[in-house]
């Protein structure tokens, strides 16, 4: 089992996260809470479909808003993914998916390469889902990508319901990262010989 434990404390958040990368096709889960119900639901979707067990404790300045909580959770989760990947020997590296959630459809592609990049193309009709600011989806994904050291492309092709659009995004990203981290050999998947 590949695992990573990360603690991060700032004046805005105090986060502990333990990540376990499960065997391919295993169902993961989130244990713990961020204090933002809808965000917890999205993280559980990410974990379930990606094959990750995530033990999480977050204390954030929710009296201000959810920005620091969501972004910093992305920083810590990205850091944990990078640590759990180790030297990346044998990982599949590339993965992509078209993922439906009812009427919403998301396209996602990832390269677990050590090169951080995010392309994000999604729009929402509402500003808020529960206590979750829809603008924070891109902030979370940027923090995740840059701290994991992955190239991440996300495009919402269509959808009417913001809950479905957002959930489709989180599930697609989780699924892609889980697939990219599957181990198929002992070689590093790069013509350069390193990632």
Describe the role of every protein-language-model region.
Residues 1-195:
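Structural preference for solvent-exposed beta-strand-turn elements
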